[in-house]
């Protein structure tokens, strides 16, 4: 997989705003290009299964938010259902299915992505999990009247414009009967520098992981920014390891709250003391 390639060096991300005061919303990620290198894209989807468990911290999110919703469904005598919006290569859907099985919970997971390249790859690498992958957008499921016990996404929010963010969050509220939790990066200089060092061995690899990952950090929110962008009913929850969640628990989810584990309790929003905060 390592070879010379025409991908731009990650150092170009330091040309502007080196202190990460502002979101880099105008810089596109390479893998979002419909004409991007298909080999690099395939390699990137494959590496997501290695990198996301290390950087996305989904296990505590599953324990605190998703598992209680699945247990509530089990008490009603039915399988729990999870919708993964923007599922990419399906690594999060596969992980949640495995964790639920270990917890003795029956779960049906649907992964959706408007990019057919993602859903094709996810379906081809499902590894017997049995998740359903569909090439469509969240508003299509709203129109179909579908509902799920938990609606999730991974590293999606920073890709969206303000209008798209509002639309996806509105769809998430309509689609969940329990909890909606969107797990994303939290922008900071420390996160950027750590990722720059950690992915240095991939600097000349035929993958998008390094360039797009560094850009994703620059595009992501700080807690105060996300709070201002969220509509009523949503809250920004700061997590360890440079993570930031957008969480909604509706009326149907109130009973779920009591079943939450005391695992990785979200920190208070410490925007003022964020080590990456400069303004």
Predicted regions and their residues:
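A short, conserved alpha-helix within the catalytic core of class I
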Residues: 160-171
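Class I SAM-dependent methyltransferase SAM/SAH-binding core
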Residues: 83, 89-91, 96-140
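Conserved beta-strand signature within the Rossmann-like core of class I S-adenosyl-L-methionine
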Residues: 176-185
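A conserved beta-strand element that flanks and buttresses the S-adenosyl-L-methionine
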Residues: 152
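N-terminal, positively charged/glycine-rich alpha-helical extensions of SAM-dependent methyltransferases
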Residues: 1-47
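Conserved Class I S-adenosyl-L-methionine
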Residues: 219, 223-250, 279
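C-terminal alpha-helical "lid/dimerization" subdomain adjacent to the S-adenosyl-L-methionine
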Residues: 185-229
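Class I SAM-dependent methyltransferase Rossmann-like catalytic core
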Residues: 38-64, 69, 73
């Amino acid at each position: 997989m390592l070879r010379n390639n025409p991908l731009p060096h990650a150092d170009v991300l330091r040309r502007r705003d080196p202190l990460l005061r502002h979101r880099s919303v105008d810089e596109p990620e390479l893998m979002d290009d419909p004409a991007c290198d298909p080999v690099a894209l395939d390699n990137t989807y494959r590496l997501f299964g290695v990198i996301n468990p290390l950087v996305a911290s989904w296990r505590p999110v599953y324990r605190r938010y998703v598992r209680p919703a699945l247990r509530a469904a089990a008490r009603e005598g039915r399988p729990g259902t999870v919708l993964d919006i923007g599922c990419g290569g399906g690594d999060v859907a596969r992980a949640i299915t495995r964790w639920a099985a270990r917890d003795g919970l029956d779960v049906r997971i649907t992964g959706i992505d408007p990019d057919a390249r993602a859903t094709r790859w996810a379906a081809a690498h499902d590894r017997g999990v049995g998740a359903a992958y569909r090439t469509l957008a969240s508003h299509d499921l709203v129109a179909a009247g579908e509902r799920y016990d938990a609606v999730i996404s991974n590293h999606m929010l920073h890709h969206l414009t303000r209008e798209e963010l509002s639309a996806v969050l509105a769809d998430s509220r309509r689609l969940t009967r329990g909890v909606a939790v969107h797990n994303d990066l939290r922008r900071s200089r420390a996160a950027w520098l750590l990722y720059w060092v950690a992915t240095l061995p991939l600097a000349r690899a035929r993958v998008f992981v390094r360039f797009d990952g560094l850009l994703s950090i620059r595009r992501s929110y700080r807690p105060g920014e996300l709070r201002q962008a969220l509509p009523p009913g949503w809250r920004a929850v700061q997590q360890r390891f440079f993570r930031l969640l957008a969480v909604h628990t509706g009326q149907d989810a109130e009973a779920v709250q009591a079943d939450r584990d005391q695992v990785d309790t979200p920190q208070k929003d410490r925007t003022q003391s964020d080590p990456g905060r400069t303004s």
